Design a protein with these regions (language model features):
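Class II aminoacyl-tRNA synthetase-like tRNA-binding/catalytic domains
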Residues: 2-119, 127-131
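Generic recognition of stable, solvent-exposed alpha-helical segments in well-folded globular domains
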Residues: 21-25, 29, 137-144, 148, ...
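A generic secondary-structure signal for well-formed alpha-helical elements
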Residues: 34-41, 149-160, 309
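A glycine-rich phosphate-binding loop feature that marks nucleotide/adenosyl-phosphate handling sites
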Residues: 47-51, 165-171, 320-324
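A general structural signal for short secondary-structure junctions and capping/turn motifs
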Residues: 68-70, 92-98, 118-120, 168, ...
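Short connector loops at helix/strand junctions that flank enzyme active sites
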Residues: 74, 100, 123, 203, ...
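Extended, charged alpha-beta segments that form solvent-exposed binding/catalytic grooves
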Residues: 104-194
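A translation/RNA-centric and nucleic-acid-associated enzymatic feature enriched
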Residues: 109, 180-335
Length: 335
């Protein structure tokens, strides 16, 4: 069920056409800055992959991908849910070296998404990945990369604030770091999402680390597929969004599994049979490079920097008609 709402008294500060112009400004500026910060080359990306390749992202393990057959092929294909695993293979196939990386515009359909102000069945993000060395496979590398991405976010906010005087600046000078276990210890009686809002409200911007494995409570902070992020070396970039008074995730990222952590996480998740899929088998056999990577929401970023109340104001998607009508009655058009 859609749980979208409008904050009391909210009125868009840009009309639809002005918003379209502003969206391009946000995307163009951030994309250029990110490529410089992380030494990334833009590449073309697939919209769908073979169902039997093991390349699609299984997300939390319960979301159903959109699948269909192709007349001249002997296997079904799936719309990607992210490019997390495809990018790792592409780095090898395209001849990238340690310290070099790629990024792509990723469009996905997540049919089982619970829609609200931040979540849509259509996902658009910059998916990036770069090769690292065995010596770089540590938390210091992770934090250094988070700070580089955060610099791009702050540069973008400064640029948009100069273009539109109503934007102002929300982001603090530095991003903070905390693990999911530290967060659970601080707020044991709150849900994971409530904990995120509390720490985001306190810090302004925070990287919440180590997502996917079980905490001391016996429950994970959030779900993560077992075959791309190393759950001990990943996290989310979360900022505080005053307009909605909530934690606002802009990016999910991490150092990717090696053979050891992949085997361990498949076992913990109870799906060791996935080790027989082509991508996972190549990884276990040492045929893929060590990498780190992530996704950065394009519409999420535009919504945040243009101070919009709903992602449908910056993204053309499908919403329940009652939501569309209710928003239109208050002067807000969902694309």
């Amino acid at each position: 069920m859609d749980s979208s709402y409008l904050p009391s008294g909210y009125k868009p500060l840009l009309d639809i056409r002005q918003t379209q112009v502003a969206i391009k400004k946000v995307k163009d500026f951030f994309e250029r800055d990110l490529a410089i910060q992380l030494n990334l080359t833009r590449v073309s990306a697939p919209l769908f992959v073979r169902s039997d390749s093991g390349l699609n992202d299984t997300l939390n393990g319960v979301e159903r991908p959109v699948a269909f057959d192709i007349k001249d092929m002997d296997s079904d294909v799936e719309i990607v849910q992210s490019l997390a695993k495809w990018k790792r293979r592409a780095l090898k196939d395209y001849g990238f070296k340690p310290g070099e990386g790629l990024y792509a515009d990723m469009n996905a359909i997540r049919r089982d998404e619970d829609t609200d102000n931040l979540h849509s069945v259509f996902v658009d993000q910059w998916d990036w990945e770069k090769i690292i060395t065995p010596e770089q496979r540590n938390v210091d590398t992770l934090k250094r990369t988070v700070r580089a991405i955060y610099r791009s976010l702050r540069h973008t906010e400064t640029y948009i604030a100069e273009e539109y005087d109503f934007v102002g600046k929300f982001l603090p000078d530095e991003i903070s770091f905390i693990t999911t276990q530290e967060l659970e210890d601080m707020y044991p009686d709150l849900t994971p999402k409530q904990r995120e809002t509390e720490i985001a409200r306190d810090k302004g911007a925070v990287f919440i680390m180590q997502i996917g494995g079980k905490l001391r409570s016996g429950k994970p902070h959030d779900g993560r597929a077992p075959d791309y992020d190393d759950w001990s070396l990943n996290g989310d970039i979360v900022v505080y969004y005053p307009l909605l008074d909530m934690a606002y995730e802009l990016s999910s990222m991490g150092i990717r599994v090696n053979a050891e952590s992949l085997a361990s996480q498949l076992e913990e998740r109870g799906c060791p049979e996935r080790a027989e899929l082509p991508f996972q088998r190549d990884l276990l056999n040492g045929n893929l490079p060590l990498t780190m990577g992530g996704g950065i929401g394009q519409s999420r970023m535009c919504m945040f920097f243009l101070r919009k109340a709903h992602i449908g104001e910056v993204q053309a998607s499908i919403w329940p008609q009652e939501t569309v009508d209710a928003f239109r009655a208050q002067g807000v058009c969902l694309l």
